[in-house]
UniProtKB/Swiss-Prot annotation:
This is Phenylalanine--tRNA ligase beta subunit. Residues 39-154 form the tRNA-binding domain. It catalyses: tRNA(Phe) + L-phenylalanine + ATP = L-phenylalanyl-tRNA(Phe) + AMP + diphosphate + H(+). The keyword Lyase does not apply. Its cofactor is Mg(2+). Residues 408-483 form the B5 domain. It comes from Staphylococcus aureus (strain MRSA252).
Amino acid sequence: MLISNEWLKEYVTIDDSVSNLAERITRTGIEVDDLIDYTKDIKNLVVGFVKSKEKHPDADKLNVCQVDIGEDEPVQIVCGAPNVDAGQYVIVAKVGGRLPGGIKIKRAKLRGERSEGMICSLQEIGISSNYIPKSFESGIFVFSESQVPGTDALQALYLDDQVMEFDLTPNRADALSMIGTAYEVAALYNTKMTKPETTSNELELSANDELTVTIENEDKVPYYSARVVHDVTIEPSPIWMQVRLIKAGIRPINNVVDISNYVLLEYGQPLHMFDQDAIGSQQIVVRQANEGEKMTTLDDTERELLTSDIVITNGQTPIALAGVMGGDFSEVKEHTSNIVIEGAIFDPVSIRHTSRRLNLRSESSSRFEKGIATEFVDEAVDRACYLLQTYANGKVLKDRVSSGELGAFITPIDITADKINRTIGFDLSQNDIVTIFNQLGFDTEINDDVITVQVPSRRKDITIKEDLIEEVARIYGYDDIPSTLPVFEKVTSGQLTDRQYKTRMVKEVLEGAGLDQAITYSLVSKEDATAFAMQQRQTIDLLMPMSEAHASLRQSLLPHLIEAASYNVARKNKDVKLFEIGNVFFANGEGELPDQVEYLSGILTGDYVVNQWQGKKETVDFYLAKGVVDRVSEKLNLEFSYRRADIDGLHPGRTAEILLENKVIGFIGELHPTLAADNDLKRTYVFELNFDALMAVSVGYINYQPIPRFPGMSRDIALEVDQNIPAADLLSTIHAHGGNILKDTLVFDVYQGEHLEKGKKSIAIRLNYLDTEETLTDERVSKVQAEIEAALIEQGAVIR
């Protein structure tokens, strides 16, 4: 939105520079993106009067003009503009003057004739050709009214001005108008805002005698009104109005069209003006378009309509596409005499869909899309009637023809001074707060401690108490909020919560094991939403996802970790070890919030040991991944157990569930070869744990023991067993018969292949013995070892 300071002064008067005003507006929530100064780079620009014009003796397209610029004698200026003529008031850049683009005006001779200055077009003084009236597109600008030669041309053109460009957020649609901005400025400077004149001298003839209005779709069009103006004269609008439109980025057309656009900018209320005699009937019917119905819009384009489009009709034929663009046969033309002015409220969603589908974005549609102020609908139409009467010689018929209900002009919200002060740390009295609301143009009522604020419809961004609190903070001034320290009744030393402490421990363990922490998106594709999910629950899908890859909330962290590993491997980083602690989401019943559960997941692929100085290269395998998980359990003083499992997406023979206190809390396994190949990964191992479940278990105390005074002893045992017997079953048997001197076991080799029967595998296990009270003897260890071997043989193992 472009806000002219010269125009703004018509509604509110302040004693401050435009730069200070722009800074103040920005600091209170509306960003002023740019400040356009029309006086910049311009010097010695005056009004001139062309006293005479003669053809240049040596150039067919040049004219020698004698121009009065308010000095003792006229100056001679050679001009090539086709529309220059004697008797015109024009813009003159004097010798020594300067124009935009660094152009300096000097005395010169053009084809032998002296030229002392330059008669200027609007383009030459910095106006974009996009906004210049068509009558001056290819020539100099000519004032339509008498001027005083020698006066400042920028002042005569209302261009002695600076324009603020607002970068508005969607919630501040009120600032899409001059009056809305004036309310804001008046509040900032605690001054009054003056509204423009809207009262016309009306004829005794009633508009109801010439027109009827019917709404067939009040769910989409809650209100539609029209007023009638007769005997308008189509001519250029006054210069001040044209220039204000130009500064706002709109090309002037004629007085009737310009008044429509002017009121749009003034009130933020889009209007449409129909040629009453071209409508074709005395009725206006608002309805939904019929399927396949066609109409030609003002841009001479035939549009095929959908039933979702709203149309204004003469009872049969569409004469306008509501809120977007008018129809061609009812538009205002040079011979138009009688005008019907439309003011309405249209459904924002319908207007947005229509304008986007037809690629017809306009000043009107953008305002309807954001919602308009009900308080300004009729007032804007009345303002247009007044301007047509004043600047188009129109005769305004009395009464308004309307259908539907405008709705409330205000929304009451109750609040207290205590609530405001407690929220933002102020110490304002009730009177101070009421004054701020009154500055904003909000009426108030006081009942004891309660302030009832009447929020006008133009401020659609204010719907709850917190919005009112923000308004108080804005107008009072964020910079004026006092700096205070919080007061505590009791001061305690800060510390981590139990969950924070345990989370930090887990991260340290995983980082110490060589894994890097990853943070991935919570959104995945619909296909990946249930991949690796430990619970089969309904997914949570976005209504309008930005892409198919981010359409649903995840139920596992692994899809994005696999994607991250694949991304790294594709970029020559083939040894990837990642973990993530993050939330997954499970849907509940309709209308209920989803369950949000924190998971711990990891992925390992490539070599675990990669540098020679670290030792022999070690490729990631199941047992290494399990060792990482076991480190987590040891750090948390928990005991995990493992059980063979089949999980979609994982290798059927190298996957296990992870149990804690006989409850499944996760899984570990090798990525299925097909899935790994699809992601250009070699053997890859993953794990996932319900982190919330880990955190819920009481860790208890870790009991430390002195370093043993007596040496321990190790024995290795190699077993040949059926390939479907898990190592965990063998270890369970070993510990059951190891007595109190068997301290721990370690599987250090697994072999299948040559020299073994089909369906068999060899497992090598190290048994570590220790007695803390005395030195172990071979006889004692051998006895326990024999008992263990006997139990294993009974289980079906063959001692190798």
